[in-house]
Amino acid sequence: MNPRRKSRLKVVVSIIFGVAVAAGLMLYALSQNIDLFYTPSEIVNGKNDDPDQKPEVGQRIRVGGMVVEGSVKRDDKTLKVEFEANDIGPSITVEYEGILPDLFREGQGIVAQGVLIEPTRLKATEVLAKHDENYMPPELGDKLKEQHGAAGISEADLKGTSARDKAEIERTLKTLQGEAN
């Protein structure tokens, strides 16, 4: 090979190497900014109940669920808040330091973004509350419908208006009336 071809080959190899390094760095940077969405059940049990598809400790994720009634603990001296979030399954603990949204309440839907610091504990950097009683983030709504359907839970069950719920209310009322007499 003559010297001219060698220099051209070096330039071409250098350009290809540079493009490969740049592409690798871009993919690495993008992977650091991807926040995968999970429900609390998926964090504990894995996606589709597959333990191999659980998020890893240290991974950035987004979690959508409902704030468990009676689980909110506030630090009196700081803005630290800790609460449980669940869907229809197990709960996870969410730690957050900052001002919570005005619409944050127990029993309401939230989406928390942060880092998983233990298998069932999230250190949140952002907490979003749902906007009104009918709003639910689309990704959370889809996941909950999927899980509810698999568990045999209907929309009427969730609203407390199913035939089973009405029968349970009637039984409870009869029991209470019997105790009152």
UniProtKB/Swiss-Prot annotation:
Cytoplasmic compartment segments: 1-8
Periplasmic-facing ranges: 30-181
Region called Disordered, residue ranges: 135-166
Residue stretches of biased makeup (Basic and acidic residues): 135-148, 156-166
Binding positions for heme per the UniProt entry: H131, Y135
Positions of transmembrane segments: 9-29
MF (Gene Ontology): heme binding; metal ion binding
Compartmental location: Cell inner membrane
Domain of life: Bacteria
GO cellular component annotations of the record: plasma membrane
Record membrane topology: Single-pass type II membrane protein
GO terms, biological process: cytochrome complex assembly
Predominant location category: membrane
Key words, A-Z: Cell inner membrane, Cell membrane, Cytochrome c-type biogenesis, Heme, Iron, Membrane, Metal-binding, Signal-anchor, Transmembrane, Transmembrane helix
Stored InterPro entries: CcmE, CcmE-like_sf, NA-bd_OB-fold
Stated family: Belongs to the CcmE/CycJ family.
Reported function: Heme chaperone required for the biogenesis of c-type cytochromes. Transiently binds heme delivered by CcmC and transfers the heme to apo-cytochromes in a process facilitated by CcmF and CcmH.
Name of the featured protein: Cytochrome c-type biogenesis protein CcmE
Protein's organism: Actinobacillus pleuropneumoniae serotype 5b (strain L20)
